[in-house]
């Protein structure tokens, strides 16, 4: 008689399905890097707001900073998508993360050792917005390259959970650091988080691809 195939417990199947995209090594590196990076980013957002309000005592200034962060993303994300289609996505992400690291370090040094002015914070905010305009489309399309279409839905769900978790954890950590240390420490920690992500990208092993010019021909 034919032996009936063994059935896996429902709980085991559901857990495996929930974490399906993590079977891809590159996505695992990306996933844990995002946890670190997004937590640092939300820490910096809270610290930046605290700094701007202490410099100006103006709620309007806080709104202007949010505007400077978001307007480049609104205006230039399309160009970031075009760039992501034409060049290696990982290289774009390494470059954008390096720019973000430099800007966070600049914010740290100005806050810790200089007489920081609100206009300087504004320029850095705009620079980070420009960085995101090119980082976001490359990062989103890079997920498809890492997991393929089969596990894409699961990867999107995990990315969403990471984003929302970081949105809770990051501000909480920022509050502790602001009360125990300084606002500059938040900026420094965020810079370190970018460095961790850059190292993760550089350790990924990507499959060799045909030359883009060959593909067009």
Residue ranges, per PLM feature:
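Alpha-helical transmembrane-bundle signature of multi-pass membrane transport and export proteins
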Residues: 1-217
């Amino acid at each position: 008689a034919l032996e009936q195939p063994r059935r896996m417990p429902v709980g085991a199947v559901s857990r495996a399905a929930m974490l399906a995209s993590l079977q891809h090594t590159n996505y695992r590196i990306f996933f844990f890097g995002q946890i670190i990076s997004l937590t640092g980013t939300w820490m910096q957002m809270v610290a930046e707001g605290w700094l701007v309000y202490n410099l100006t005592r103006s709620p309007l200034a806080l709104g202007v900073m949010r505007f400077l962060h978001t307007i480049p993303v609104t205006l230039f994300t399309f160009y970031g998508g075009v760039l992501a289609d034409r060049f290696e996505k990982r290289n774009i992400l390494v470059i954008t993360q390096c720019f973000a690291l430099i800007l966070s370090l600049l914010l740290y040094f100005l806050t810790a050792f200089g007489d920081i002015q609100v206009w300087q914070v504004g320029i850095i905010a705009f620079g980070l917005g420009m960085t995101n305009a090119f980082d976001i489309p490359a990062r989103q399309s890079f997920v498809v390259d890492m997991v393929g279409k089969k596990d894409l839905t699961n990867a999107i769900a995990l990315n969403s959970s990471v984003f929302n978790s970081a949105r809770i954890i990051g501000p909480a950590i920022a509050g502790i650091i602001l009360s125990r240390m300084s606002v500059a420490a938040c900026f420094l920690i965020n810079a370190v988080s970018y460095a961790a992500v850059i190292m993760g990208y550089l350790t990924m092993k990507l499959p060799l691809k045909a030359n883009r010019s060959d593909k067009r021909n």
